[in-house]
Amino acid sequence: MRDETPEQPAPLRFGYTTGSCASATSLAAARLLLTGVASDTVDIVLPKGQHVAMRLAFCRATDDGGAEAGTIKDAGDDPDVTHGALVFARVRLVHEPGVRFRAGPGVGTVTRAGLPIAVGEPAINPVPRRMMTEHLAALAAEHGYAGGFDVAIGVENGEALARKTMNPRLGIVGGLSILGTTGIVRPFSCSAYIASIHQGIDVARANGVTHIAACTGNASEDAVRARYGLPDIALIEMGDFAGAVLKYLRRASVARLTLCGGFGKLSKLAAGHLDLHSRHSSIDLPLLAEWAGEAGASAVLQHEIRAANTSQQALALALAHHVPLGDVVCAHARRVARDIVPGEVDVETLAIDREGRIVGVVP
């Protein structure tokens, strides 16, 4: 007989960012070069001052006179694409003081403007760069070393893993980004996903795109492509995070925004929800019935919609009676968006059904 689920579930484990992994491995490799000591663990200081000890998978000299160290990325209980990946650093000592960063295998290179890293640079974000620089500077001072460090950061299978992220669309080619602002991955915080939404908007703006489309998934992206012929750089994969798009446009506005999603997702936005995930919002069938009434639905039809099992069934009932429920939902969703984005942004909403057909539009 299966044990009962405990009433108080265990707290979710936090993990460490790729930036923390890069800091730990680069420090361990550099310490081996300066002291001859290979470590099993390495202590680092996170951006907010926490001290953590990170276990290493290896720390060894290389044939070219340098050293390398690696660690297995532990994202805790967060569903992170890099969880379990080997993050490693290869370090060489150089005469010129300071730290030079390079993209090792599995780490991408920036090819488009709009990201916090210059075009042509390895996709190692500012905070991880600062963490590595500070740790290496402290190590050099401790051992009286006046030279510099050449640091290549890599991720095993990073190029394949990157295809599961937004990096290709952002113009980061060849692999993953080394990320993190606090050094810690908090379970289900989705901070990396939201950051990639913001970066997508930044890249579009920096490359002269004036019309972006924020879409909940692949089907909505396909619908937008077919309708407008927008390039990939103009498509923002917002998933469930409509609020992340709308709020960011307050400080990084564009001339035109198209919001496109499945009918059910868009009905949640229309009801005022900015997080469209089922954990945080649900379909309001009584509200859909009320809106159907606004569009001319009879009392009987409203009752049927109220009793529907799903939003798709509610939509099918409305369409069967020639009630444009999709348009009404789009109108309410547009109103919610308009209340958040700057006045100069032209907002359009599109709703699609399960087959990807447009069932509602408000320009």
From Swiss-Prot:
Pfam family, one: CbiD
Domain of life: Bacteria
UniProt GO molecular function: cobalt-precorrin-5B C1-methyltransferase activity
UniProt entry tagged with the keyword S-adenosyl-L-methionine: yes
Catalytic activity: Co-precorrin-5B + S-adenosyl-L-methionine = Co-precorrin-6A + S-adenosyl-L-homocysteine
GO biological process: anaerobic cobalamin biosynthetic process; methylation
Keyword terms: Cobalamin biosynthesis, Methyltransferase, S-adenosyl-L-methionine, Transferase
The keyword Hydrolase is annotated on this UniProt entry: no
E.C. number(s) listed in UniProt: 2.1.1.195
SUPFAM superfamilies from the UniProt entry: CbiD-like
Stored InterPro entries: CbiD, CbiD_sf
Top EC category: transferase
The protein's annotated pathway: Cofactor biosynthesis; adenosylcobalamin biosynthesis; cob(II)yrinate a,c-diamide from sirohydrochlorin (anaerobic route): step 6/10
Similarity remark: Belongs to the CbiD family.
Protein's name according to its UniProt entry: Cobalt-precorrin-5B C(1)-methyltransferase
Organism this protein belongs to: Burkholderia mallei (strain ATCC 23344)
Lineage: Bacteria, Pseudomonadati, Pseudomonadota, Betaproteobacteria, Burkholderiales
Gene (name only): cbiD
